[in-house]
From Swiss-Prot:
Recorded coiled-coil stretches: 820-915, 956-988
Ranges for the Sequence repeats: 85-88, 109-112, 228-231, 255-258, 278-281, 323-326, 346-349, 402-405, 428-431
Protein name per Swiss-Prot or TrEMBL: Outer kinetochore KNL1 complex subunit knl-1
Gene giving rise to this polypeptide: knl-1
Locations listed in the record: Cytoplasm, Cell cortex; Chromosome, Centromere, Kinetochore
Keyword Lyase attributed: no
Organism in which the protein naturally occurs: Caenorhabditis elegans
Subunit-structure text: Component of the KNL1 complex composed of knl-1 and kbp-5. Part of the ten-subunit outer kinetochore KMN network that includes the KNL1, MIS12 and NDC80 complexes. Interacts with the protein phosphatase 1 (PP1) catalytic subunit gsp-1; the interaction is direct. Interacts with the protein phosphatase 1 (PP1) catalytic subunit gsp-2; the interaction is direct. Interacts with the MIS12 complex subunits kbp-1, kbp-2 and mis-12. Interacts with the NDC80 complex components ndc-80 and him-10. Interacts with knl-3. Interacts with kbp-3. Interacts with kbp-4. Interacts with kbp-5.
GO biological process, one term: protein localization to kinetochore
Length: 1010
C-alpha cells in the first residue's frame, strides 16, 4: 500500500515528452534534409510547422490547422483528448506580384496576413534573415512631410536653371486626404516595354486636390503632383521653359484612352491650349531639373515644353477633342472646325524657347515629341484640300527620325518645273520616336528596335518596301499607304545641282513665310533657324532613303554588278503579321512573286567585288524606261495626287551636299540615319547568321558515319560533296577583298551571304538546280576522293595515329605498342565472331553480307543492331585508347621528371661557365702587359696569402685527423682493457668449475667404494 502513492507521485513528476513527427522532405533546390513538425500554439489554435533541422529554419508551408476545444496544459503540450482538426491546404499556385514579370500588371498580389503562407509566395522571403520566425504585428504610422524649396528667378540666363530643382508643393501624406489611384487591367503588350501603355486612370479627388505621394518612391526623382486642371495660372512663370505642363487657360481633359470613343464635354472653353492637343497616353510627371543637363533640347520638347502660346490660336468654335487619336476622333474634330488659319499651324514640333545647349554634344539625335506629331495629325484633318504626310505612330524596324516632305498639289502644267518647290504651309515635321517619357535618349542608338502590334481598328496601314541584297538580305521600310503615295507622273532622278536649287528655293520660301507669322513675336528668329534645319534634314533624308533605279544590263560579259530597285512602295506590300512577341528583325519570311522578285535589288558577282560600291551611283535612265516605270507606278498607286522628286548619289555625294548646311543638322541626321540603320540591320543579320550556322554545323562523327555507309554501299556522296562545295564557296566569298565598307566596317554586299540560304541555287526565272550567278563565277576545288572506312575510323573516334611523315623511317614505339594492343583486341573480336558462327546463330548469307558490307540488304532493325554494335565497339576502342594514353602519360611524366632532375644537375655544374669569357679577357690582359713592381708585389702577396690559407686549411685538417686518431686510439685501449678483463673473468670461472668437478668426482668415488 505504501508503494502506490510513490508511483502516483512519480507519474505526476514525470516529464512528458513532446510529440514530434519526423518526416523526410526532399527539397527541389538542394539535398534532402530532415524536417520536424513542431507544434506552436497561439490562441488555442495549433499550427504544425515544418522545421528544417539541417538549415535551422522553419519552412513557410503550413499544411494543417487544428482548432483546439480543450484547455492546453501548463507545460504547453496538449493532452490527447477529443479535438476538432481543420485541414486546409493552400492552393498549389497563387498569383504573386511580379515587378519584372514582363509588364503583366493584371495579376494581383496576395497581401493577406494569414498565417497560412503559400510556399510559392516569395514576397516575404527577401527579409527572412533569422533562423526562428517572429510574431507578425501591424503598425500604422502617419507621417506628414512638408518640403519647401526656393527657386531663384533668372528670366534671361537659364544656364544655372538646369541645376535647380522644381517648385514642390506641400506634401500631405495623410490617408484621409489621399487620392485613390486605381490601376486597371492593362492588356499584354510588347515585352520590351518601350511603347505607350493605354491606361484608364480613374481618379476620385478628396479635399486638397493632390495626388497620393505613396507611389512616388518608385518614380525616377522627386516628383511634383501632376495637376490635371491647368486653368489657374501661376504667378511665377520663370521656369515655364522647363516645367511640365505648360501653364495656360486649358480646361481639364479626360484621360480615358479608347479606340472608338468620342468625347463630348458639356463645358465650352474659349481657347484651345496646346496641352489639349498633346498625346497624354501616359501621365507625364515632372522630373527634377537637376538631371536636365543630360537631356537634349528635343527631349525637353518631348515632354511638352517650350510651345509658345502665341503660335497656336484656333477659332473659338472648337470643342474639346478626345485624346484617342483615331479616324473617328479626327473626323469629329474636322466636323467641328470649319476653318483653320494656315499661318497659325506651322512648325509646332520645334521648341521655341532658348534652351542651353552646353551638354548638347553628349546628346543623341534630335527627336520630335509624339505629342507634336499628334497635334499635326489633328491639324491635318482640318484642311481637306491639302494632304499632309502621315506616318504610323511607331516604325517597326528603323528607330530613326524620318522627316518626310510632301509637295503641295500643283497644276498639271507647273508640276514638272516646280517639283521641289515647297510652301511654308506645307512643311510638316513628322518625326517617329520611341515613346519613353522622361528618359534620356543618349543610349537609344544601342537599343534594339522593337515592333508594335497595330490594332485591327487602326486606320494606319503599314506597308513595307523590301530591298533584297543578293537573294537574301532585305531592308524593310515602313510607309503609310493611306496618305504618303508616289506621284502619278514619272519618277525623276535629279542631280546634285537640282538638289542645291531645291534647297535654295526651300530656304527662300521658308524665310518669306516665316516673316509672315507673328512678326511681333519674340521667337521669329528661332522659327527661321528651325525651318532651315528641318529643310536640310529633309534633303539629307531624301538623298539617303529613296528608291534606286538602274538599268539591268543584258551583256553577259559585263562584270559590273547591276542593281534593280523597286519602282513603287506598294510592290512588296504585305499585311503586318503577328508582332506581339516577335523579335526586332528586318526580314520576314514571305513568298515573292515574279514581279516583286524582278523588282528587288539583285547583285551579280564580279571578279573584283570592290567595284560594287563604285558603280552603285545611279545613272539617268532613258525616257523609254521612265515611261515604263511610270506606267507601273500608275497601276500600283491610283490614289496618289502629288509629285515627288527623288535623288540618290551615294554616301560620298550626300556628304558633299550637306557640307554647305549647318553642321548640327548634318551630324544629327548622320547619327539618326546610320546608327539606327546599322543597328537594326546588323542585329537581324547576326541573328540569321547564328541560326544558319547552327543548322549548317554538322558533327564530324555524323559526317564520317554517313561517309562510311555510303562507301560501303558503293554509292556517291552527293549531299556531303555539295555541302563541302558550298562551304568552300562561302569561305572564298568572305575572303574576297572589299574596299567599299559602310560606316560600321561591314561589307554591305557580303554581310548577309550564306550558303545555307533557301534562295541559293534556286530562282524563279531559272530551272531547278541551276546555280546562281555568284556560284558560277567562284572557282571550286575538286571533290574529295572516295575512301574505304577502316575498322576503327579516325574521324569517328578522333584517333591520331603516331605515324611519321616519311614512310621510309621507322614508326614510333608508342604506335607499335598501340597497334599490338589493337591487334589483340581484333583477335578477341574475331574469336567471338567465330564462336557465334559455330553456334549457327547467323545464317551464311547474312555473314557474307556483313563481310561485303551490304547493309541495305538487311532490315531496318538489323541495320540498327549493326550500328549499335559498331558504336559499342567504338566505345570499347575509345576506352582502350584512353587506358593506353593514361599509361603512356604516366610514363612520359616520369621521364620528364628524370630529365628535369638531370638538367638541374647539369645547370649547377655549368653555373660558372657564363663568367669564363671575363676570366679569359683578364688572363689575356695579364699576359700581354708585363706586370709592374707594385702589381707583382700584390700578386705575390695574394699568392702567399692563398698558400698560407691552403696551409692553414691542411694543418687544420691534420689536427682534426690527429685528434680523431687519438680519440680512436684511447677508445681502442679501453676496449682492449675491457676484453682482457673479460678473458680473466672467464678463466677464473673455468678454474672454479674444474675444482668443483674434481671435488664432486672424489665424493662420487668415495660413495662407490662404500
Amino acid at each position: 500500500m505504501s508503494m502506490e502513492p510513490r508511483k502516483k507521485r512519480n507519474s505526476i513528476l514525470k516529464v512528458r515528452q513532446a510529440v514530434e513527427t519526423i518526416e523526410e522532405t526532399v527539397m527541389n533546390s538542394g539535398p534532402s534534409s530532415t524536417t520536424t513538425n513542431r507544434r506552436v500554439s497561439f490562441h488555442n489554435v495549433k499550427h504544425v510547422k515544418q522545421y528544417d533541422r539541417d538549415h535551422g529554419k522553419i519552412l513557410d508551408a503550413t499544411p494543417v490547422k487544428e482548432k483546439i476545444t480543450d484547455t492546453i496544459g501548463s507545460d504547453g503540450i496538449l493532452t490527447p483528448r477529443g479535438g476538432n482538426m481543420d485541414i486546409s491546404e493552400s492552393p498549389a499556385c497563387t498569383s504573386s506580384f511580379q515587378v519584372f514579370g514582363g509588364g503583366n500588371l493584371d495579376k494581383t498580389m496576395d497581401m493577406s496576413l494569414e498565417t497560412t503562407i503559400n510556399e510559392n509566395n516569395e514576397t516575404a522571403r527577401l527579409f527572412e534573415t533569422t533562423r526562428d520566425p517572429t510574431l507578425l504585428y501591424e503598425k500604422i504610422v502617419e507621417t506628414t512631410t512638408k518640403v519647401t524649396e526656393r527657386i531663384v528667378s533668372m528670366p534671361l540666363d537659364d544656364t544655372l536653371a538646369m541645376f535647380n530643382t522644381t517648385n514642390q508643393e506641400d506634401k500631405d501624406m495623410s490617408v484621409d486626404r489621399s487620392v485613390l489611384f486605381t490601376i486597371p487591367k492593362v492588356p499584354k503588350h510588347n515585352a520590351t516595354m518601350n511603347r505607350t501603355i493605354p491606361m484608364d486612370l480613374d481618379e476620385s479627388k478628396a479635399a486638397g486636390g493632390q495626388c497620393d505621394e505613396t507611389m512616388n518612391v518608385f518614380n525616377f526623382t522627386n516628383l511634383e503632383a501632376a495637376e490635371m486642371d491647368t486653368s489657374k495660372l501661376d504667378e511665377n512663370n520663370t521656369m515655364n521653359a522647363i516645367r511640365i505642363p505648360i501653364n495656360s487657360n486649358v480646361m481639364p481633359v479626360d484621360m480615358d484612352i479608347t479606340e472608338h470613343h468620342t468625347l463630348i464635354e458639356e463645358k465650352k472653353n474659349d481657347t484651345f491650349g496646346p496641352s489639349q492637343l498633346m498625346d497624354i497616353s501616359a501621365p507625364q510627371v515632372q522630373v527634377n531639373d537637376t538631371l536636365a543637363i543630360f537631356n537634349s533640347p528635343r527631349d525637353i520638347c518631348n515632354k511638352g515644353l517650350g510651345v509658345p502660346q502665341n503660335l497656336i490660336n484656333i477659332a473659338s468654335n472648337v470643342v474639346p477633342v478626345d485624346m484617342d487619336i483615331t479616324d473617328q476622333a479626327v473626323l469629329n474634330a474636322e466636323k467641328k472646325n470649319d476653318q483653320f488659319e494656315t499661318s497659325q499651324l506651322m512648325d509646332i514640333s520645334i521648341p521655341k524657347v532658348l534652351v542651353n545647349d552646353t551638354m548638347a554634344m553628349f546628346n543623341s539625335p534630335k527627336h520630335v515629341s509624339k505629342s507634336s506629331m499628334d497635334l499635326e495629325k489633328t491639324i491635318e484633318a482640318a484642311d481637306k484640300s491639302t494632304k499632309y504626310p502621315s506616318i504610323a505612330d511607331e516604325v517597326e524596324d528603323l528607330d530613326m527620325d524620318m522627316d518626310i516632305t510632301e509637295q503641295q498639289p500643283c497644276e498639271a502644267g507647273n508640276q514638272q518645273n516646280d517639283g521641289l518647290q515647297l510652301q511654308k504651309e506645307d512643311l510638316m515635321d513628322i518625326s517617329v520616336i520611341r515613346d519613353s517619357p522622361a528618359v534620356n535618349d543618349t543610349m537609344a542608338v544601342f537599343q534594339s528596335p522593337a515592333r508594335v502590334k497595330i490594332g485591327a481598328n487602326n486606320s494606319i496601314i503599314d506597308s513595307q518596301k523590301s530591298i533584297v541584297f543578293g537573294d537574301e538580305m532585305s531592308i524593310d521600310e515602313t510607309q503609310n499607304d493611306g496618305t504618303l503615295t508616289l506621284p502619278k507622273s514619272n519618277v525623276e532622278v535629279t542631280t546634285t545641282n537640282d538638289v542645291y536649287t531645291s534647297l535654295e528655293r526651300q530656304e527662300e520660301n521658308a524665310s518669306e513665310n516665316v516673316s509672315m507669322i507673328n512678326e511681333s513675336s519674340v521667337h521669329s528668329e528661332i522659327d527661321k533657324k528651325s525651318f532651315m534645319l528641318i529643310e536640310e534634314e529633309r534633303a539629307f533624308m531624301h538623298s539617303s532613303m529613296i528608291d534606286v533605279a538602274q538599268k539591268l544590263e543584258d551583256d553577259g560579259s559585263s562584270k559590273t554588278p547591276v542593281i534593280l530597285a523597286s519602282q513603287s512602295a506598294s510592290l512588296a506590300t504585305k499585311e503586318p503579321s503577328a508582332l506581339h512577341n516577335s523579335s526586332a528583325t528586318l526580314n520576314n519570311s514571305m513568298e515573292l512573286d515574279n514581279n516583286t522578285l524582278l523588282k528587288t535589288m539583285q547583285i551579280t558577282t564580279c571578279e573584283d567585288i570592290s567595284m560594287v560600291h563604285e558603280s552603285i551611283a545611279v545613272e539617268l535612265n532613258s525616257n523609254k524606261e521612265q515611261e515604263q516605270f511610270g506606267d507601273e507606278t500608275l497601276q500600283k498607286n491610283d490614289t496618289s495626287n502629288t509629285g515627288a522628286n527623288f535623288t540618290f548619289q551615294g554616301h560620298n555625294e550626300t556628304s558633299q551636299i550637306m557640307n554647305n548646311v549647318d553642321s548640327e543638322a548634318v551630324n544629327t541626321s548622320k547619327i539618326s540615319t546610320y546608327s539606327a540603320f546599322n543597328l537594326s540591320i546588323n542585329q537581324s543579320i547576326s541573328k540569321r547568321r547564328r541560326s544558319l550556322l547552327n543548322s549548317a554545323r554538322e558533327s564530324p562523327r555524323r559526317v564520317a558515319l554517313e561517309n562510311s555507309i555510303m562507301s560501303m554501299n558503293g554509292q556517291t556522296m552527293e549531299a556531303l560533296t555539295e555541302y563541302r562545295q558550298n562551304k568552300t564557296m562561302q569561305t572564298s566569298q568572305d575572303s574576297m577583298p572589299s574596299m567599299s565598307l559602310n560606316d560600321s566596317g561591314r561589307d554591305i554586299l557580303a554581310m548577309n551571304t550564306s550558303v545555307r540560304s533557301p534562295h541559293l541555287n534556286s530562282s524563279k526565272t531559272a530551272a531547278p538546280g541551276t546555280p546562281s550567278l555568284m556560284s558560277q563565277n567562284v572557282q571550286l576545288p575538286p571533290p574529295s576522293p572516295q575512301f574505304e572506312m577502316p575498322d576503327f575510323d579516325p574521324a569517328v573516334v578522333n584517333v591520331v595515329y603516331l605515324t611519321s611523315e616519311d614512310p621510309s623511317t621507322e614508326q614510333h614505339p608508342e604506335a607499335l605498342k598501340f597497334q599490338r594492343i589493337v591487334e589483340n583486341e581484333k583477335m578477341k573480336v574475331q574469336h567471338e565472331i567465330d564462336s557465334l558462327n559455330s553456334t549457327n546463330q547467323l545464317s551464311a548469307e547474312k555473314i557474307d553480307m556483313l563481310k561485303t558490307k551490304e547493309l541495305l540488304k538487311f532490315s531496318h532493325d538489323e541495320r540498327e543492331a549493326i550500328m549499335i554494335a559498331r558504336k559499342d565497339a567504338e566505345i570499347k576502342f575509345l576506352e582502350l585508347r584512353l587506358k593506353f594514353a593514361l599509361e603512356k602519360k604516366i610514363e612520359s611524366d616520369q621521364e620528364i621528371a628524370e630529365l628535369e632532375q638531370g638538367n638541374s644537375k647539369m645547370a649547377e655544374q655549368l653555373r660558372g661557365l657564363d663568367k669564363m669569357a671575363v676570366v679569359q679577357k683578364e688572363l689575356e690582359k695579364l699576359r700581354s702587359l708585363p706586370p709592374s713592381r707594385e702589381e707583382s708585389g700584390k700578386i705575390r702577396k695574394e699568392w702567399m696569402e692563398m698558400k698560407q690559407w691552403e696551409f692553414d686549411q691542411k694543418m687544420k685538417a691534420l689536427r682534426n685527423v690527429r685528434s680523431n686518431m687519438i680519440a680512436l686510439r684511447s677508445e681502442k685501449n679501453a676496449l682492449e682493457m675491457k676484453v682482457a678483463e673479460e678473458h680473466e673473468k672467464f678463466a677464473q670461472r673455468n678454474d672454479l668449475k674444474k675444482s668443483r668437478m674434481l671435488v664432486f668426482s672424489k665424493a662420487v668415488k668415495k660413495i662407490v667404494n662404500f
